[in-house]
Amino acid sequence: MESLYETLRTLPLSVSIPLTTSIIIILSIVTNVVKQLWFPNPHRPPVVFHIFPFIGSTVQYGIDPYAFFFDCRDKYGDCFTFILLGKSTTVFLGPKGNDFILNGKHADLNAEDVYGKLTTPVFGEEVVYDCSNARFMDQKRLLKLGLTTDSLRCYIPKFVKEVEDYVKNSPYFKGDTGIVNITEVMAEITIYTASGSLLGNEVRSMFDSTFATLYRHLDDGFQPINFVMPGLPLPQNFRRNHARKVMEKLFSDIISKRRETGNQGDETDMIWMLMNAQYKDGEPLPDHHAARMLIAILMGGQHNTAVSGAWLLLNLAHKPHLVQELYEEQTQVLGSPQEPLTWENLQKLTLNGQVIKETLRLHSPIHSILRQVKSPMRVPGTEWVVPPSHTLLSSPGTMARSEEFFPRPSEWDPHRWDKIEPLVKTAEDGQTVDYGFGVMSKSVSSPYLPFGAGRHRCVGENYAYAQLGAIVATFIRLVHIEQPDPKAPLPAPDYSSMFSRPMNPAEIRWRRRETVE
């Protein structure tokens, strides 16, 4: 070793520095490989074999997470650890894994240490992941109060009108037929329907000007790099921070103006609900909390609905016979000429609901749910212990793509729900729990968990079904859709994006119906 050191000293820096660096890299690689092959830790889940210490399995996971999970499950079982950019990430698949992670005690694991870096610069401080878990659960309770069935009844006509106006006035739908990028179309439709229903007429009217730009700049804050380094001096982060401050002031001004007028009328939007809300301890909800929660509810669900809607319509375009079935179902349920779509008759559109469920099964926008381990956690039935240095990863979508639960799992077939609905229902064992925002099923054994489970289950589930259901029903009533190239396959998922959207070109051909009853 001394002779090597002396040799390196005699070399010029232009040679010794690259050579020394290469030696260090080679030694670290050799050490890493030897440790995995000959000195595995029997008290830890098996580690996915990798060559480069820091990179680990990052590339394979990033290219196709589901393929990576299934391949690792075949080799290592349901529980294994892989290296994600230097971080030991323990995956636990299946019902036991979902229960271990999603129903885990907050003292043992949490979500805020993972997601707080990403969401706090977008939503603001003191809300969501930038407050105590008890306060966050109370905030979810308040948001849920604005998503009742009575509220949804009021929202359905707004959803319908937004889609009708969009198809009538958007430059994407000029003439009687054309080709559109459905990802862009659904992004616009979902933000218009969400803002108009949840945030009221003032906000919706601003979406054609100032608000749309602010929203886009805030949206740019959802970049994967911000999971690790949210404060980087990047142009999009400067725009994100400015947009959040301006949007918060806009919401606060709307709240102040409404307090002055006090004229709610028939409006049932979330602003009216939050401006009069109280925390469980009796403290009135501060206006700046309300403003930041409004940003969170607008941003939090719009991406999922937009991506799911795009996948849904792309799949329908590949199966025109289902488009016709959906149209005929509306005629049968709503009559001809059709009566207005309401919450009650939306529930009667069975196939309309099934295309949503099948899309969420096969194209769940979130493939990985992460939690930071806070205290050592023993994996049930093993001697393995997951240490606090690890991140836990749950992937309910792997069950939804498993042959064990869904025959021909890679096939998009809404009619499968004609037969398997009871299977999903019976997976709930009757156990319930209240994390602070309402009683819910504790079971995580269902193979269909598109909205997650446990204390961080999405409170907007019913709203999402209603919004997407009304959008799809109205869209199909107005236009017929098909794929531009009958031989082209469905676009592949873009797993480099935050929400697994379809890769471009994600296009459909539309044709305006001759008569819209």
Curated annotation (Swiss-Prot):
CDD domains: CYP51-like (cd11042). The chain crosses the membrane at residues 10-30. Signal peptide: none annotated. One of its GO terms (biological process) is sterol biosynthetic process. Keywords: Endoplasmic reticulum, Heme, Iron, Membrane, Metal-binding, Monooxygenase, Oxidoreductase, Transmembrane, Transmembrane helix. Disruption phenotype: Decreases the amounts of 4,4-dimethylergosta-8,14,24(28)-trienol, the product of the Fusarium sterol 14-alpha demethylases. Leads to reduced ability to produce conidia. Results in increased sensitivity to tebuconazole, diniconazole, difenoconazole, flutriafol and prochloraz, but not to triadimefon and propiconazole. Affects ergosterol production in the presence of ebuconazole or triadimefon. Reduces virulence on host wheat ears. Host-induced gene silencing of the 3 genes encoding sterol C14-alpha-demethylase leads to strong resistance of host to Fusarium species. Its cofactor is heme. GO terms for molecular function: heme binding; iron ion binding; monooxygenase activity; oxidoreductase activity, acting on paired donors, with incorporation or reduction of molecular oxygen. Lanosterol binds at Y115. GO terms for cellular component: endoplasmic reticulum membrane. Disulfide bonds: none annotated. Itraconazole binds at G300. Belongs to the cytochrome P450 family. This is Sterol 14-alpha demethylase CYP51C. It comes from Gibberella zeae (strain ATCC MYA-4620 / CBS 123657 / FGSC 9075 / NRRL 31084 / PH-1).
